[in-house]
Amino acid sequence: MIEDISKKIAWLKKNPKMLKGIFRGIERETLRIQKNGHFSKTIHPYLIGSSLTHKWITTDFSENLLEFITPTSDNIDYLLSFLTDLHSFTASKIKNERMWPFSIPYCFNDQTNIQIAQYGKSNIGKMKTTYRIGLKNRYGDLINTISGIHYNFSLPLFFWTNWENNQNKKNNTDLISSGYLNLIRNYYRFGWIVPYLFGSSPAISSFFLKNTKKKYKFKKNKEDIFYLPWSTSLRLSDIGYSNTNILDLNIMFNDFNEYIESFQNALKTPSKKFINIGLKDEHGNFKQLNTNILQIENELYTQIRPKRKTKDGESLLEALKNRGIEYVEIRSLDVNPFSPIGINKNQILLLDLFLIWCALIDSPKIDKTDFLLTTKNWERIIYEGRKPNQKIYINNNNETKTLIEIGQIIFKDLNEIALILDSNSNDLLYQKACKETQLFLKNPELTYSAQCLNFLMTTGIKKTGLYLANKYHEKFINKNYFNLNQSVLEQEVIRSHQKKIEIEREDILSFEEYIRNK
């Protein structure tokens, strides 16, 4: 079952400063749409900056899929206001367009023209576009327009170096990497609680269901939107944004060196399925970067990833190998449609508590049987999380308990951790967020997915989406900046375009040579 961590919490209560200095970062994706809800057909606006080199505003899969990236900070209000400033600036440059508030796009037919993101004529720009062409050919383009929130989280160095469980590690790098792998394994075990609480994609367009095996009996509304009565986050399902089963790749997060080796193997091992796509078309244009299981590191779609900031010319794996894990990236958050910026403060506070808890509790190594059971738990919550008396596997003997029972055990600890964090800042923010969110366990109608489904059934996805998109747009264009200002943002636009031109001028190798050297 779940370890009793009362002694560990008692230790933290005596040493609350161990949890002072948590750093976070947010990445928010959102589709640019026309006023009628259809996909924008325009390229990434020049007035926003270069998507290749802008520090804070870029594109993801397609030209109309915006991505906002905050710097890291230990101040939650700063992060949220910075993210709001980026939205306000963007809204001022796309006055005839809107930002779609849901993770799942509104698709009125299957002929939606999706323009893959373009990054210019430099080798790095061509590589980014070719990678996306590969994603289209491997998984389809519509599936890659599903948007989400990525939450980056790191615990203070002081915590890792003083944490009693880590005293036998050789050096700080090993100690921290091992600690984050413990956290990651526990996130796989218990992270299903995140889509239960905050999942916001209980419905999906019929076009996403083409050529997929339906494990569950979907219902359909008048807009041709398919839904399940108890679902939470279809974005995280095999219908949505997923590709490779990490079990097949033997990526188990048990040992740092084994993780690196397994990841490298996936990047080097050819895939029969992708060989059949072909590397180039009849005109000699690349159809994908290579025919390996993964083209690059970013293609491994998982609920949580170990990360490290990279230096110029360095890959993520090289950075991890050289300097260890620096932070974790949570990828299982849907866009929160009830927040103009896709995420709110309560969510961040709750995620902090839960990730600290994942770092504190015992984290045995995961074997394949364990991993299959954790996958079943995630699947149950994704498809039927709000089902009354929903059961969760608690060990590999197929023993189960109800979601409410396990959730209450988790929240008992989270409330204790909240007390410690609030003592550092002399307020009640964490305790308040914890108590409010705990109500979702016994009152599933309070969950984001239940609220979303209610709107989709009564008002419809198009009407609800456009109402929220217009409401948020007006809010953004009439809002004063918090941290940034118009001048700083305009200067970044100019700098980004200049930097893009510099990169293009400095290229020496042909694109083929560049790819070969990667």
UniProtKB/Swiss-Prot annotation:
Which GO-annotated molecular functions does the record name?
ATP binding; glutamate-cysteine ligase activity; metal ion binding
Q: Which InterPro entries match?
A: Gln_synth/guanido_kin_cat_dom (IPR014746), Glu_cys_ligase (IPR007370), Glut_cys_ligase (IPR006334)
- GO CC annotations on file: cytosol
Enzymatic reactions: L-cysteine + L-glutamate + ATP = gamma-L-glutamyl-L-cysteine + ADP + phosphate + H(+)
Listed EC numbers: 6.3.2.2
Keyword Nucleotide-binding set for record? yes
Q: Which Pfam families match?
A: Glu_cys_ligase
Which keywords accompany this UniProt record? ATP-binding, Glutathione biosynthesis, Ligase, Nucleotide-binding
SUPFAM superfamilies to which the protein is assigned, alphabetical: Glutamine synthetase/guanido kinase
Q: In which pathway does it act?
A: Sulfur metabolism; glutathione biosynthesis; glutathione from L-cysteine and L-glutamate: step 1/2
Q: Could you tell me the Gene Ontology terms of the biological process aspect for this record?
A: glutathione biosynthetic process
Concerning PANTHER family, the annotation shows: GLUTAMATE--CYSTEINE LIGASE
State the similarity comment.
Belongs to the glutamate--cysteine ligase type 1 family. Type 1 subfamily.
User: Mind telling me what this protein is named?
Assistant: Glutamate--cysteine ligase
The root-end lineage is: Bacteria, Pseudomonadati, Pseudomonadota, Gammaproteobacteria, Enterobacterales
